[in-house]
């Protein structure tokens, strides 16, 4: 092997080793950031949980049940549900958001900053939370599969959630039933995996959103989808209802 070739080989080994070294550092940094945000009951020190109290579902349930909507962190410091309070909370480890505010008729705090990226179930989350009407358009719901009755009887809710990634959602039964003021376009929703949408807009008196492009080819249950949706006059002639087995009312 001549000197020139040897030099090329050594140069390659050096560059490869250096690249591997930096990749290893980056991996460990990212791993450290992720682990940091998994420490329930502690204050995050970096990443998306930085400065926030890392909470569990049970922490939320306890704070809701006593009506304080506040979780006590280290040093007896209060961390509020609403953004901009005495301290924010980090919800990125919670999978189950179902029924959190069910029946909380006066709840209307700004929780748009919550991290919902791990959520899989949001059924009944705001069921009968009649006053709730906050901007939650930035929520990451890409892993959610169930949204049944999510806004059932949430009579004041009328926020733009057209940007939600609902591509993994399978069940949206009664999602907006009796959500009297809801009237937003949902034309960007990918409902291709939805199989159940019975009563979804039942009693949604103001709803006249554009849903003409929905892919309903996998939906089996269409029962009473628009019963009582007095304002709805959109064209849904192109809906594929070939999988429908229940289409009463």
Features from the language model and the residues they span:
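A cross-taxon signal for low-complexity, glycine/charged-rich
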Residues: 4, 22-25
